[in-house]
């Protein structure tokens, strides 16, 4: 079992609903306190029941900071209650005809008890039946940790050298069980505490 809340920023308080019904144009100053209190209780109860909760939320640009930064909406309740906070950004993935076929989703661990904070990874999501590309980024990770060797503009696999596009065109042929085990170890070194 898992609880999913989509989205925290779209929740309304009873005060906000009353204000809308009475045509009052006032700001709801109780929302962040209610969210903080709710997550204080939920974190304890869900932890005891060993039930994970996944929450989506929006971010906004912090005005006036020296460096441009993003912050979550809804106050600090979720920020302190969460075990993991991952910020997602996306860019369009285009094919050779310049048509949009999916998104490149970049993930940054802002807070984590499971992986190194600040670590970043990208994945690809196609809009068709291919869906989430489970091999995206593995060539680069494999090169970094010696699973693959780059020879010029090709990748050496065993005795042969292959273009990266050929590997990605038929990934099941090249990402064998043995290669995937090595990549799993590389991912642990890259993203786990204590490497």
Regions found by a protein language model. Give the residues of each.
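Terminal-proximal interaction/regulatory segments of ATP-powered molecular machines
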Residues: 150-195
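N-terminal cationic and glycine-rich segments that engage phosphates or anionic surfaces
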Residues: 16, 61-65, 151-156
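Phosphate-binding/switch region of NTP-binding enzymes
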Residues: 28-145
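Intrinsically disordered, low-complexity coil segments
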Residues: 21-24, 129, 161-162
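Short secondary-structure boundary/hinge segments and terminal tails
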Residues: 13, 64, 95, 159-160
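Conserved inter-motif catalytic segment of the P-loop NTP-binding fold
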Residues: 1-37, 41, 168
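Short secondary-structure junctions and interdomain/linker hinges
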Residues: 2, 49, 53, 116, ...
